[in-house]
Regions:
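Active-site-adjacent "subsite" loops/lids of carbohydrate-active enzymes
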Residues: 32-37, 45-91
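N-terminal carbohydrate-binding/catalytic regions of secreted carbohydrate-active enzymes
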Residues: 1-39
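Structural preference for beta-strand elements that scaffold enzyme active sites
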Residues: 9-11, 43-49, 90-97, 134-140, ...
Length: 195
């Protein structure tokens, strides 16, 4: 099959709120293999997407296990992807996407929140250091990440610039998302586009 024009990657949310029969928090592995097979036959990479606003906190960054009552750590989720890939060698994920946005109402310009942003950058770095070499890493960021300067690896500059620097070195993709706290206006917009 030919590659789909203009589309080269799917970033698929794989988080399942309850443990599955695979002892993971991933969707059904057979259905996942079917999706990956279909995408790969069209020349499209598939990356498992995960995220949690708590991950940039110091106790969550690259710990192997969650810190109760927190969610699962990024390393546990990467391990599940690696475990899935081992069990389905013909239908492997091509990478992992970290979709770590701040909680609703988060103000990046507040001094205390700089630590969260610095933690986010540290999370990306330690994820890169522990991610299996055969998996790509993509990240999703807010469209407002340039509003405050933070310190990272010896320099102080806007968070977005640090992420761009990482992207130029090692990140597969940086997705810029315009998050919304409500769906106000969405129905009208969809109605206008469909009409």
């Amino acid at each position: 099959m030919a590659a789909s024009p203009g589309m080269d990657a799917l970033h698929v949310s794989m988080y399942e709120p309850s443990e599955s029969i695979n002892d993971s928090r991933m969707h059904d592995w057979d259905a996942t293999a079917d999706l990956i097979d279909l995408a790969h036959r069209r020349g499209i990479d598939v990356l498992a997407l995960y995220g949690d606003p708590a991950w940039p906190e110091a106790d969550m960054r690259c710990n192997a296990h969650r810190q109760p009552p927190r969610s699962f750590s990024p390393l546990e989720l990467m391990n599940w992807v690696a475990k899935y890939n081992e069990s389905r060698p013909d239908y492997r994920f091509d990478g992992v996407t970290l979709d770590v946005e701040s909680a609703s109402g988060f103000d990046e310009t507040l001094e205390g929140n700089k630590y969260w942003l610095e933690g986010l950058l540290a999370l990306y770095k330690c994820t890169l250091e522990t991610l299996p070499a055969d998996l790509k890493l993509a990240v999703t960021i807010k469209d407002s990440c340039d509003s405050v300067d933070v310190a990272f690896e010896g320099s102080v500059k806007p968070t977005c610039q640090h992420i761009i620097d990482l992207a130029n070195k090692v990140l597969e993709t940086v997705i810029v998302a315009g998050y919304r706290d409500s769906a106000d206006g969405t129905i009208d917009r969809i109605g206008n586009e469909v009409a």
